[in-house]
Amino acid sequence: MSNVLPKGVFDIFPYVTNSKNLWRNSFLWKTVEHAAHRICNLYGFDEIRTPVFEKTETFLRVGEHSDIVKKEVYTFLDKKGRSLTLRPEGTAAVVRALLDHSADMRKDNKIYYILPMFRYERQQSGRYRQHHQFGLEAIGVRHPLRDAEVLSLLWDFYAAVGLKHMQIQVNFLGGRKTRARYDEALREFFRKDLDKLSTLSQERFHANLLRILDSKEPEDQAFIEQAPSILDYVDDQDLNYFDSVLAELKVLGIPYKINPRLVRGLDYYTDLVFEAVTVVGDHSYALGGGGRYDELVAQSGGPAMPAFGFGVGLERVIQTLLEQGAALPTAPRRLRLIPMDESADAFCFSWAKHLRHLGVATEVDWAHKKPKTALKDAADQQVGFVCFVGEQELSTKQFIVKDMSLHQSFSGAQQDVEQRLVYEVQNA
């Protein structure tokens, strides 16, 4: 049986060797996820795990005119007719969780997650209907240094996994007054050429004007380039905030570029927005993004609380790492015990358990293969060490361990071999 998965989903699998699908290797995923956990812990952020599905109304708050709500969600009715939606993004779910646990909510909530998201997106390279997101939400504090701190965390994550040629592109959308002034200017600008815009941008003109700037349609690009810049409509107080964040990025050595056409696909963003991109020649593509959303908590029924966050698509991160030729992590070196016949089975079972208690990852090949076949299988499966156990080893308690990567062997009494294995594992 093959090819039975629905479109847009994939397995993260431990035995992937095909170079085309190497990005699906589970150890590679585990390494990237571990880096995210480690960096978040260093910055004092705590993990949250929200349900895979929630009431549909939870996600309507991201904006009724956003692409997610209009056409990308997996929504269904349960057996009692209640509308439920598979989680399409993390921020609304985190805000809902904080409000549900309001008695435990802090003045400064520092939350992160690594979770699958679900969107019914058009099939194309790098886009999946179930994708995995590393996200972070800092809810409760509005300060330029908080924004810079979150961007620093994201930058440290990219550095930890080995991404190169990264840049932060930033824009400032301002608050309600700024947006109102800018919307008026933008509407006036696009109105005179409305019939020349793409069908999608004509729809956005009436429903979500700012998203025209996010259009990728060829017929829109010349108009977008000539459109007014929102930075010309930001008041002095907001501009000082923006400048303070940029000054701190400069201190941190994080390369950035002001992109006045940058908008985000969700309606809740205010003030600072950004995308983290990898730059290749004259082209760039996003590996993450986010911004400030100071009104969403109140819109969700909670108190007025400022917030700043981001989301990173792990599929794109891992694929880009491979495209950039990053040094791939190696799996922990395991020992494979190979009993030569049934008489050695009980000993291997007991010894494997003891070795695991010592911290040596150990498995047993119970198939009683011929030595040549067993060695070939171990090599193909990238096993670190191999030890055959037969009648002679059982009687003398002397063992030979083959290092499969160095093509060398070491031998000795059982306790000596154990000490050497512990050393090799700890110093791998």
Swiss-Prot record:
Cited InterPro entries: aa-tRNA-synth_II (IPR006195), aa-tRNA-synth_II/BPL/LPL (IPR045864), Anticodon-bd (IPR004154), Anticodon-bd_dom_sf (IPR036621), His-tRNA-ligase (IPR015807), HisRS-like_core (IPR041715), HisRS/HisZ (IPR004516)
EC number(s) recorded for this UniProt protein: 6.1.1.21
Keywords carried by this UniProt record: Aminoacyl-tRNA synthetase, ATP-binding, Cytoplasm, Ligase, Nucleotide-binding, Protein biosynthesis
PROSITE patterns according to UniProt: AA_TRNA_LIGASE_II
Keyword ATP-binding among UniProt keywords: yes
Subunit (UniProt): Homodimer.
Record protein name field: Histidine--tRNA ligase
Organism of origin: Chlamydia muridarum (strain MoPn / Nigg)
Gene: hisS
